Amino acid sequence: MDKTYQPHAIETSWYQTWESENYFAPQGVGDSYTIMIPPPNVTGSLHMGHGFNNAIMDALIRFRRMQGRNTLWQPGTDHAGIATQMLVERRLEAQGVSRHELGREKFLDKIWEWKAESGGNISRQIRRLGSSVDWSRERFTMDDGLSEAVKEAFVRLHEDGLIYRGKRLVNWDTKLHTAISDLEVENHDEKGHLWNLRYPLADGAKTAEGLDYLIVATTRPETMLGDAAVAVNPEDERYKALIGKFVELPLVGRRIPIIADDYCDPEFGTGCVKITPAHDFNDYEVGKRHNLPLLNIFDKNANVLPAAQVFNLDGTLNESVDGSLPAAYAGLDRFEARKQIVAAFDAAGLLVSVDDHALKVPKGDRSGTIIEPWLTDQWYVSTKPLAEPAIAAVEDGRIAFVPKQYENMYFSWMRDIQDWCISRQLWWGHRIPAWYDESGKVYVGRDEAEVRAKNNLGPEVALQQDNDVLDTWFSSGLWTFSTLGWPEKTKALKTFHSTDVLVTGFDIIFFWVARMIMLTMHLVKNEDGTPQVPFKTVYVHGLVRDGQGQKMSKSKGNVLDPLDIVDGIDLETLVEKRTSGLMQPQLAKKIEKQTRQEFADGIASYGTDALRFTFCSLASTGRDIKFDMGRVEGYRNFCNKIWNAARYVLDKGEDCGQNGEAVELSLADRWIISQLQRTEAEVTRQLDQFRFDLAAQALYEFIWNQYCDWYLELSKPVLWDETAPVERQRGTRRTLVRVLEVALRLAHPFMPFITEEIWQRLAPLAGAQGKTIMLQPWPVANEARIDQAAEDDIEWLKGLMLAVRNIRGEMNIGPGKPLQLFLKNVSAEDQRRLSENDYLLKKLAKLESMTVLTEGAEAPLSATALVGDMEVLVPMAGLIDKGAELARLDKEIQRLQGEVQRVGGKLSNAAFVDKAPPEVIAKERAKLTEAEQALGKLAEQHARIASL
């Protein structure tokens, strides 16, 4: 084996071997265990969230595969409608071409070209992370089989009365010219205004105060062109007498009614609210309650129309309401119209005041443009009938959320679910399987031929397919079963569905998880007709944030690419990567400065195993995952530790009883075997409960602290002792080999590469059969091998050795200097342990002699420590220069006193505490505590040496 562990050298070659040997495919025996990869965007690249997700899924799949389950981890990518279309449009714009100039077919060809060019990027990255997915089953949400499944799902839902077309208010993205869902809208806190406008009362009506007008407050004066009413609270005494009367709409001249509705807050503004049902979601609900007309005043760009389109609530045209609008505003953009309308109100003496007002401004998460509530024809899924069984499946335990608290988030959304708008005005995606004849009548079918046959339409009837495509989340919602061949009753569908676990971030519980449950339960049935669930467990993890707890985003400049941690990246390339392609180029300088400070030497190459182990160790039940590069470095050291231990074991491991020769187990052998049983049980228990952090912790503790730090040291005196029986030496060699081999199997789901590399060399010595560690059996604890007596004895031994080690450290005595040891207050049990382990203790603690003091006997002046009730004494004569040691301690104490004074002064300075960021203050406080503790220890040491 190489002297040092070089991850690069082994990772790519092992992955190729595993893939070419087909180890990732289901083995065809045992109960099935299935995970579907949440499909990343085909044209994107993996971020830290994906890296985390993959580490967790692969740990589960490798664990279950070793347990003998018939595992399928199926990969695939998502066509990601809006994101991909925007990306390709931007590329074309850079060449001076728009999609409209190209036309639909040619534009789609361009997207497929781009997919072919960049689609392999994701697959390459997934491979680099060591993910053991079955590549032979890779799927894409727009491939032929999935397109058929999407059409089938749409048609069946339509036939069941669960998909309908209707004119409703939607979130309209005026830049992308498509409807988007509530979940794709981000609300931004901004400072805005509240305009107070006068609306004259009609027919000579007066308020209780004798005024002939009402004052309405609005944050969107431009929408007054589409007002259908003014609402007041039914209990508001000021306006009770006016309910049912009319106002004259300024600038337009339309008479609109005064209505009573609980939506109005009498305390807000004047208590009068303008109601624009076609341009505000709350007003739309008021309009439904009062059967108000819907006046749409904007086109798809949110420019004012020459005349309002007036509709009834059922989407039919309303011809009884006059939709005339002032010609002056026709064609104006909504914000320009706002300026001119406010100016017109002011000129007419109808602008009362303009107040500052905090707003929540809705913006599209992709385009960043302000969303316009807009009346348009769209396709909808009726979700309430689908939500009921989906809620029941979680309530009765057919689906479990881990951690359980996420069930509440799921329930609260599902119980208040709105119908789902599934049509998008895009070109890239699954085109809606609906056709229109010339009169506008709509027909739904799997293809045009089926539509014609089903509805007896001859060739003389011209049909035009709907131009819209389906929301990406519709096809993603079918992911667990469409990828297994549904609607055909395939063997794969029967074997691997329902799947076992979905691993996902909490941010897409609504987007994806809920919709998968609803669609799967409606469309996929068991043989007895009962609904299948898509998965039995939803493991929900938090968002991966940076070390300061900030969300990782391009604009913050704190994004890390998991492969840069695996392979390393130099500083200049990292700066270039973080500052190019910014939406806000003005941030580049700040991001560059921050990157140069944080990664002055770039990022070292840590290898996949260290990164994966970091992800697993961070997978707690919390909402957020704070990613810390220090942890990756720590786990890279852990890899080195395992590598060095393996080199020692391979060097010492020959003649370890491979052929059944007699062995004798030492106390240390029995102890480490006992500890191994406990670790096997603990790692298995924690993986069963999805506590990857606790499983990783148990493994780390066993390998680093017990096996490497203690057992390897305890093995040396046995192997060095020329007088030791050959059976005992063979027993220790066998234990070294076999315990490491089992530990490698336990670590394999977390660290696949290093464990495979070492296992290949160790397997012959351990008597292990098979070509790969991947398909070795998962270790199962044997309670009969738990040896409490050996554990107690070794704990005592460790206590004594640590006591001697601490005295050396405190008194500044070199580790190689032989010591005399006196022991006082020694019990019979202590005496037994001393005599049985005399050779071991003298060798490892570097002791010249050990003397048990009889009662009343005194040791020379000594440094002391306690092991239980037993006193450990090391005489100091000739070991230290008392004067020099006190002078050294005085100097160190003086330095620390200065540090305490400096940091304490800083923290008691109000100006510093008020202005410094919380993380800086926390750092300073930690510094102060550390210095104070060190000072206390040095003072004790000083007193002890002074008393010698």
Swiss-Prot record:
Catalyzed reactions per annotation: tRNA(Val) + L-valine + ATP = L-valyl-tRNA(Val) + AMP + diphosphate
* Keyword terms of this UniProt record: Aminoacyl-tRNA synthetase, ATP-binding, Coiled coil, Cytoplasm, Ligase, Nucleotide-binding, Protein biosynthesis
Which molecular-function annotations from GO does this UniProt entry contain? aminoacyl-tRNA deacylase activity; ATP binding; valine-tRNA ligase activity
InterPro entries according to UniProt: aa-tRNA-synth_I_CS, aa-tRNA-synth_Ia, Anticodon_Ia_Val, M/V/L/I-tRNA-synth_anticd-bd, Rossmann-like_a/b/a_fold, tRNA-bd_arm, tRNAsynth_Ia_anticodon-bd, Val-tRNA_synth_C_sf
Q: Where does this protein hold ATP?
A: K554
Q: Name one GO cellular component term.
A: cytosol
Chain location of the short sequence motif 'KMSKS' region per the record: 551-555
Which chain regions cross the lipid bilayer? none
Fill in the domain comment.
Answer: ValRS has two distinct active sites: one for aminoacylation and one for editing. The misactivated threonine is translocated from the active site to the editing site. The C-terminal coiled-coil domain is crucial for aminoacylation activity.
Task: Output this protein's name.
Answer: Valine--tRNA ligase
Organism equals Pseudomonas syringae pv. syringae (strain B728a)
Lineage per the UniProt record: Bacteria, Pseudomonadati, Pseudomonadota, Gammaproteobacteria, Pseudomonadales
This protein's encoding gene: valS
